[in-house]
Structure formats: structure tokens, C-alpha cells
């Protein structure tokens, strides 16, 4: 990446200095040209004097304003050289400023490209966020359905467990009744065992044998109560 260019205030000051230097150089060149013309006209000699004027002046002496004009011409030449040096410095600074300006333009172009890339990435991120929001909504709806199904399954399981408990209690009660009936049956059998030793008359042909008290007791109202199998809980 290019180095940062000079500050804007400094650049304007340098440009103003360049303008002033150019103006002073032009003024100095104009002054030097005027002084040169005056010196040249003075060197060519004065106009023809009137008769009797300056009769006492020596013929080899220069006019009175030539030395002053030569001094002013030398000063103007020095100022012109100084202004030329300043102009060269201003030109060098101008080249540096142009170089810095090109570097700034290059940086601006790269920053613009990066900004465009960031905008594209931001748009893509927004699109992905919208898609993820829709997917999250669908997942939330599915989760709600699953929770409702799980709640219904839990309710059914609780109902089944409750029914299993009721059936188990009924089975235990039935088993208790069956045990009581068996105990009573055993007592009756014990009481009837002496009566079995007495010989009974043979039944007539065609008549059905009367059922024994044991068979009647076994075919009682209990009907062989069976204990229901326990269901595995949860």
C-alpha cells in the first residue's frame, strides 16, 4: 500500500507558493527587461545636446543614471536567479504532489473495490440470514409438533399405567378371593372325607350321576380367577 500523501493544508500552501514564485519570476523578468532596455539606450549615448548645454562635462563620463540602472539590473538578475531556484523547488514539490495524488487515487480505487466487495458480502450475509430465519421457523414449528406429540404420548402412557395399576389391583383382589375359596374348599374336603368311606348305592341306568360337592365347589362363582400379568412400567 502506498504511503499517505501530504496534508491538504500543506499542499495548498505549496501550490500558493508556486503561484507567487511564478508571478515574482514574471515580474522580475519584466523588470530586468525594462532595465536592460534602459541600459542599452543609455549605452548608445544621449541625444544630441542643445548648443551650450553640458559644455563642461568630460566626453568619456557615462550618463548620471547608468550606474543606478546597472545596479538595479544586477539586483534584478539575482532576484531572477533566486526566483528560478524557487520555481525549480516548486516544480519538484509539484511533482511530489502529483505522485502523492496518484497514490491517493490508487488507494481510493482499492478502497472502492473493497467497499463493493464488502457490500456484496453483506448482501449475501443478509440473504443467508433470511434463509436461516425461515429454516429456524420451520424447525420451531416441527419442534412444537414434536412436543405436542410427546405430550400426547406421555398422557397415553400415564393412562396406560393407571389402567395397568387398576388391573393389577383387581388381579390381586381376585387372587385373594381365589385363595380364600381354595382354603374353604380344603376345609369342605376335610369335612367330607369321612362321608366318602360310606358305600353309596349304585345309580340306576339312564340316570345321571349326581355331582360331588367337590366338583360343585370347584365350579363356583369364582370361575378360576386368574391374576393378570403385570405390565412393565415406563
Swiss-Prot record:
Residue ranges of the region described as Disordered: 44-67, 187-234
Name of encoding gene: CCDC194
N-terminal signal peptide: 1-42
UniProt KW keywords: Coiled coil, Signal
Ranges in coiled-coil conformation: 66-163
Compositional bias annotation for Low complexity: 187-196
Comp. bias regions, Basic residues: 197-217
Protein name: Coiled-coil domain-containing protein 194
Superkingdom to which the source organism belongs: Eukaryota
Species classification: Eukaryota, Metazoa, Chordata, Craniata, Vertebrata
Amino acid at each position: 500500500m502506498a504511503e499517505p500523501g501530504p496534508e491538504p493544508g500543506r499542499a495548498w500552501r505549496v501550490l500558493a507558493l508556486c503561484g507567487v514564485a511564478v508571478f515574482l519570476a514574471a515580474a522580475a523578468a519584466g523588470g530586468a527587461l525594462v532595465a536592460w532596455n534602459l541600459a542599452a539606450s543609455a549605452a548608445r549615448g544621449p541625444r544630441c545636446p542643445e548648443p551650450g548645454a553640458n559644455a563642461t562635462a568630460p566626453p568619456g563620463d557615462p550618463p548620471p543614471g547608468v550606474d543606478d540602472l546597472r545596479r538595479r539590473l544586477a539586483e534584478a538578475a539575482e532576484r531572477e536567479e533566486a526566483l528560478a531556484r524557487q520555481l525549480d523547488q516548486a516544480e519538484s514539490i509539484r511533482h511530489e504532489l502529483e505522485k502523492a495524488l496518484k497514490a491517493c487515487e490508487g488507494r481510493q480505487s482499492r478502497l472502492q473495490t473493497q467497499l463493493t466487495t464488502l457490500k456484496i458480502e453483506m448482501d449475501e450475509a443478509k440473504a443467508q440470514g433470511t434463509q436461516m430465519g425461515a429454516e429456524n421457523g420451520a424447525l420451531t414449528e416441527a419442534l412444537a409438533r414434536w412436543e405436542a406429540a410427546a405430550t400426547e404420548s406421555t398422557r397415553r402412557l400415564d393412562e396406560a399405567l393407571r389402567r395397568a395399576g387398576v388391573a393389577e389391583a383387581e388381579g390381586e383382589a381376585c387372587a385373594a378371593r381365589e385363595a380364600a375359596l381354595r382354603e374353604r374348599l380344603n376345609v369342605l374336603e376335610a369335612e367330607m372325607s369321612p362321608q366318602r368311606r360310606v358305600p353309596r348305592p349304585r345309580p340306576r341306568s339312564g340316570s345321571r350321576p349326581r355331582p360331588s360337592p367337590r366338583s360343585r365347589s370347584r365350579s363356583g362363582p369364582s370361575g378360576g380367577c386368574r391374576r393378570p400379568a403385570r405390565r412393565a412400567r415406563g
